């Protein structure tokens, strides 16, 4: 029979969680087994792990290959809008599964992979789409930051480190790693720094693009299991990158002006009406993206050629940001409501408050990424005061609170005095 301890007792008899090492005084509950103890926090963590496992199994169809609709349905639960980008990713991941299944059959037709480029303004959900994909697929998946990469032999991360991380995600199972998916973020930051490549060696721009070419196309990479620079004597693992799907993403600041300039040249005549880039939303401009625009931006032709599928994401308007605040399973409002619920307080946002928060994010041009910092600033004083206040049962946030012209409204629970009179 397990015993539950609520703390108390002298220090000699203090019990500790066998998993995290916290004492019974640091946690709310400590559950005793025959020889071990586990605290309520570790139980919560175990439940989260099991929930994640259940999510992964949800997207498998009976044949073992999730359909594009199944993948998109899960993406819809977490990512608002960006329908076109989600369709592209869903089809790409589905085809990746099918190609892997096809590899095991003897066939004279070789299925080539189609790497993907995601283009969209900052804060529109490129990275979040990749993070959500990582949770729902059952092949090794890693995210790499292009800004940390340098050409081999220079200070920084080698391109081979990407394959090493994938190998680690596959628990050093080479077969599984060779069937994985790699997301390279901030790929726009490795654009060529100058139109004249002979001026100076561009080790973090064009040099990285050149280094990425082979592993994206398909090559056998020699990967040091412990990192090559610190352990030069170790044996190398051979990883074939032919079947690894690469997804690249970037904000490509300034690309909209390159696209618009091309459009202005082609739209000449008495009936031509051309909106300037300032009059159009960036996402609208990105829909007209052509490979030649990426070349002018600074990507080399060979690199653009390795990314045959281009998906553009739209910038988020006020309505979309309000949806992001409230609708996804792990929406920001739900997260803060859960935090307040731990203090037994209900957090309520008025509709005008949500729109005011969304408007601020649009003004800052930070997209969904800026929502959390705005929420933190609004709720900071409340979160500071709340643990020491007694009787608060509800906190109400209105549009005036977001604008800074009012304080959050605290609603207290009714209390009875000794004579039975009720007071707020």
Swiss-Prot record:
<dbReference type="Pfam" id="PF07724">
    <property type="entry name" value="AAA_2"/>
</dbReference>
<comment type="subunit">
    <text>Component of the ClpX-ClpP complex. Forms a hexameric ring that, in the presence of ATP, binds to fourteen ClpP subunits assembled into a disk-like structure with a central cavity, resembling the structure of eukaryotic proteasomes.</text>
</comment>
<dbReference type="Pfam" id="PF10431">
    <property type="entry name" value="ClpB_D2-small"/>
</dbReference>
<feature type="binding site">
    <location>
        <position position="20"/>
    </location>
    <ligand>
        <name>Zn(2+)</name>
    </ligand>
</feature>
<dbReference type="GO" id="GO:0005524">
    <property type="term" value="F:ATP binding"/>
</dbReference>
<dbReference type="InterPro" id="IPR003959">
    <property type="entry name" value="ATPase_AAA_core"/>
</dbReference>
<dbReference type="InterPro" id="IPR004487">
    <property type="entry name" value="Clp_protease_ATP-bd_su_ClpX"/>
</dbReference>
<comment type="function">
    <text>ATP-dependent specificity component of the Clp protease. It directs the protease to specific substrates. Can perform chaperone functions in the absence of ClpP.</text>
</comment>
<dbReference type="InterPro" id="IPR003593">
    <property type="entry name" value="AAA+_ATPase"/>
</dbReference>
<feature type="binding site">
    <location>
        <begin position="121"/>
        <end position="128"/>
    </location>
    <ligand>
        <name>ATP</name>
    </ligand>
</feature>
<comment type="similarity">
    <text>Belongs to the ClpX chaperone family.</text>
</comment>
<dbReference type="GO" id="GO:0140662">
    <property type="term" value="F:ATP-dependent protein folding chaperone"/>
</dbReference>
<keyword id="KW-0067">ATP-binding</keyword>
<dbReference type="InterPro" id="IPR027417">
    <property type="entry name" value="P-loop_NTPase"/>
</dbReference>
<dbReference type="GO" id="GO:0046983">
    <property type="term" value="F:protein dimerization activity"/>
</dbReference>
<dbReference type="GO" id="GO:0009376">
    <property type="term" value="C:HslUV protease complex"/>
</dbReference>
<keyword id="KW-0479">Metal-binding</keyword>
<dbReference type="InterPro" id="IPR010603">
    <property type="entry name" value="Znf_CppX_C4"/>
</dbReference>
<dbReference type="InterPro" id="IPR046425">
    <property type="entry name" value="ClpX_bact"/>
</dbReference>
<dbReference type="Pfam" id="PF06689">
    <property type="entry name" value="zf-C4_ClpX"/>
</dbReference>
<feature type="domain" description="ClpX-type ZB">
    <location>
        <begin position="5"/>
        <end position="58"/>
    </location>
</feature>
<feature type="binding site">
    <location>
        <position position="17"/>
    </location>
    <ligand>
        <name>Zn(2+)</name>
    </ligand>
</feature>
<dbReference type="InterPro" id="IPR019489">
    <property type="entry name" value="Clp_ATPase_C"/>
</dbReference>
<keyword id="KW-0862">Zinc</keyword>
<dbReference type="GO" id="GO:0051082">
    <property type="term" value="F:unfolded protein binding"/>
</dbReference>
<keyword id="KW-0143">Chaperone</keyword>
<dbReference type="GO" id="GO:0051603">
    <property type="term" value="P:proteolysis involved in protein catabolic process"/>
</dbReference>
<dbReference type="GO" id="GO:0051301">
    <property type="term" value="P:cell division"/>
</dbReference>
<feature type="binding site">
    <location>
        <position position="42"/>
    </location>
    <ligand>
        <name>Zn(2+)</name>
    </ligand>
</feature>
<dbReference type="InterPro" id="IPR050052">
    <property type="entry name" value="ATP-dep_Clp_protease_ClpX"/>
</dbReference>
<dbReference type="GO" id="GO:0008270">
    <property type="term" value="F:zinc ion binding"/>
</dbReference>
<dbReference type="InterPro" id="IPR038366">
    <property type="entry name" value="Znf_CppX_C4_sf"/>
</dbReference>
<keyword id="KW-0547">Nucleotide-binding</keyword>
<protein>
    <recommendedName>
        <fullName>ATP-dependent Clp protease ATP-binding subunit ClpX</fullName>
    </recommendedName>
</protein>
<feature type="binding site">
    <location>
        <position position="39"/>
    </location>
    <ligand>
        <name>Zn(2+)</name>
    </ligand>
</feature>
<dbReference type="GO" id="GO:0016887">
    <property type="term" value="F:ATP hydrolysis activity"/>
</dbReference>
């Amino acid at each position: 029979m397990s015993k539950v301890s609520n703390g108390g007792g002298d220090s000699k008899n203090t019990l500790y969680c066998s998993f995290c090492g916290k004492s019974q005084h640091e946690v709310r509950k400590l559950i005793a087994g025959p020889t071990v103890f586990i605290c309520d926090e570790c139980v919560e963590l175990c439940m989260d792990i099991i929930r994640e496992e259940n999510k992964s199994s949800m997207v498998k169809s009976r044949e073992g290959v999730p359909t594009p609709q199944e993948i998109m349905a899960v993406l819809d639960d977490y990512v608002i809008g960006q329908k076109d980008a989600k369709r592209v990713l869903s089809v790409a991941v589905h085809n990746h599964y099918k190609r892997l299944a096809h590899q095991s059959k003897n066939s004279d037709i070789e299925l080539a992979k189609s790497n993907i480029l995601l283009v969209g303004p900052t804060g529109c959900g490129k990275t979040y789409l990749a993070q959500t994909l990582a949770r729902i697929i059952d092949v090794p998946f890693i995210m790499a930051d292009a800004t940390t990469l340098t050409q081999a032999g220079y200070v920084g991360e080698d391109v081979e480190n990407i394959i090493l991380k994938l190998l680690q995600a596959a628990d050093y199972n080479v077969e599984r790693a060779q069937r994985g998916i790699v997301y390279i973020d901030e790929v726009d930051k490795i654009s060529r720094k100058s139109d004249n490549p002979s001026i100076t060696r561009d080790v973090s721009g064009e040099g990285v693009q050149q280094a990425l070419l082979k592993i994206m196309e398909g090559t056998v990479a020699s990967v040091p299991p412990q990192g090559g620079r610190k352990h030069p004597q170790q044996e190398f693992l051979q990883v074939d990158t032919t079947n690894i799907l690469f997804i690249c993403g970037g904000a490509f600041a300034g690309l909209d002006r390159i696209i618009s300039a091309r459009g202005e040249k082609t739209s000449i005549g008495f009936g031509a009406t051309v909106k300037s880039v300032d009059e159009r939303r960036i996402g609208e401009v990105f829909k007209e993206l052509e490979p030649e625009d990426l070349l002018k931006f600074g990507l080399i032709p060979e690199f653009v050629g390795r990314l045959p599928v281009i998906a553009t994401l739209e910038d988020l308007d006020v309505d979309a940001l309000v949806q992001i605040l409230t609708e996804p399973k792990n929406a920001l409002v739900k997260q803060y409501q859960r935090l307040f619920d731990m203090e037994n307080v209900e957090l309520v946002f008025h509709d005008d408050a949500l729109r005011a928060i969304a408007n601020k994010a649009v003004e800052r041009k930070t997209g969904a990424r800026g929502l959390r910092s705005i929420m933190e600033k609004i709720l900071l004083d409340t979160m500071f005061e709340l643990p020491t206040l007694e009787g608060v049962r509800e906190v109400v946030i209105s549009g005036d609170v977001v604008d800074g012209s009012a304080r959050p409204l605290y609603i207290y629970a009714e209390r009875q005095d000794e004579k039975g009179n009720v007071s707020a």
